[in-house]
Amino acid sequence: QVPTSPLDQASATLAYFAEQYRDVMARKLNRSNVSLLKQCEACTQTKLGVLSEHFWAIVYFLLRCGDAVSAHDVVVMHGADSIDPAVQRLVASLAQAQGSVDNLWQGSTYRITLDSGDRQGVADQVESLKRTERPNMYQVGVYSLLSGQQPLTSSDTVEGFKMIEDYLYSALWRAVMVANPVDELIELSNKILTLGPSHFQDASGWSFALPLLATQ
């Protein structure tokens, strides 16, 4: 069934970007011969009560793949005693919204709503996380998605943040979870048009065509 409403179109685009990223990660894991299980086991490593970078990387990758259920499982198994309760509740809400499907955005015909107080509480921590001596950009990425902060910009510290698809995924994620998602989607579309091709500095014209198509 072809999505017709702006919200359904945005959800379908999010589902596509999530599946695409899942394929990218699967290829990387196959090439490096590193199992996801071994990576998850690394999540249990802590230092001075602070969760390891591996933990936040896996939670970020799972949310980026649209798998909030698995992200919630990782949080419960490895970090429940060390994570801000607001973060736990937000991930749990996303997992509940996903239900039994493989992708949070798969067949979604409703607007996912998250507690505004929890989102604001997480948002208040984003800037302080960035100002730490060695900020964990995966944690910043998770907090940014959950709180609905402005879309992630490219980062030299996290390879996954460099792709235009990551920008669009986070931008659409934010747009569909506000009180007036249609207005937010229109604003995002207008922003892409205003920025123009020069903002998306890739040699191919596809670097601008992709955000243009994804937000129309």
Name each model-derived stretch.
Residues 39-97, 208-216:
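Extended amphipathic alpha-helical scaffold segments
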Residues 14-17, 33, 37, 106-124, ...:
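Alpha-helical repeat scaffolds
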Residues 21, 25, 29, 66, ...:
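Helix-turn/linker elements and helix-coil junctions of extended alpha-helical scaffolds
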Residues 13-20, 24, 39, 86, ...:
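Charge-rich, solvent-exposed alpha-helical interaction surfaces
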Residues 5-8, 12, 82-85, 117, ...:
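Alpha-helix boundary/N-cap detector
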Residues 56, 131-216:
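Extended alpha-helical solenoid scaffold regions that build the rod-like backbones
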Residues 1-38:
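Intrinsically disordered, low-complexity acidic/proline-rich regions
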Residues 92-137, 141-145:
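Eukaryote-biased recognition of long, low-complexity, charge-rich segments
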